Regions:
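Beta1/beta-strand and adjacent pyrophosphate-binding region of the FAD-binding site
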Residues: 1-14, 32-34
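Broad hydrophobic/π-residue packing in well-ordered secondary structure
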Residues: 2-4, 16, 78, 112
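Short coil/turn connectors at secondary-structure junctions
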Residues: 3-4, 27-30, 66-67
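Gly/Ala-rich phosphate-binding loop of Rossmann-like dinucleotide-binding domains
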Residues: 19, 23-24
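Short beta-strand "acidic-cap" motif of Rossmann-like dinucleotide-binding folds
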Residues: 28-35, 40
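Conserved N-terminal/central alpha/beta ligand/cofactor-binding core
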Residues: 39-43, 47-149
């Protein structure tokens, strides 16, 4: 039997980054990532052909598999305007750990994405006022978030 040092369940962004971080600490680790989704080349959604969700098994072909739903998204990450103090996209993290620490973590993750070939051009940041308006509307209409930060 081939022994592993670490087994990670789930190949979404958290699982992938966990493996990456562990290998930065010790590049001799034997890591296995277990993912219930199909290989990326076999992931497709039949909704456009048949007009409705068929509840793919064992899980949704869009959300399950390597890179999670991000494999088929617009690859939106939590980023911020370098000329502003405001973190424009990314939820409540700045409220929890502060703007500067959030920016440090975003920069760290962005650097890794760029290292692996991500496009360095940031789309949409020129629409700062529109982004802030959408963000504020989302906050106002979020009846499900009962957390107080």
């Amino acid at each position: 039997m081939n022994k592993k040092d670490v087994i990670i369940v789930g190949a979404g962004p958290s699982g992938i980054f966990t493996a990456y971080e562990l290998l930065q600490l010790n590049n001799n680790l034997k890591i296995t990532i277990i993912e219930k989704g199909k290989p990326i080349e076999k992931r497709n959604c039949p909704i456009n052909k048949i007009g409705k969700c068929i509840q793919c098994k064992p899980c949704c072909n869009i959300t399950c598999g390597f890179a999670g739903a991000g494999a088929f998204s617009d690859a939106k990450l939590s980023l911020y305007d370098k000329d502003s103090e405001e973190v424009l996209v990314g939820g409540n993290l700045p409220t929890i750990i502060g703007n500067q620490e959030t920016k440090n973590l975003i920069d760290y993750c962005d650097k890794i994405y760029l290292q692996f070939g991500a496009d360095p051009k940031i789309e949409g940041i020129e629409n700062k006022n529109e982004i802030l308006e959408i963000k504020n509307k989302a906050k106002e209409n979020n009846k499900f978030n009962r957390h107080s930060y």
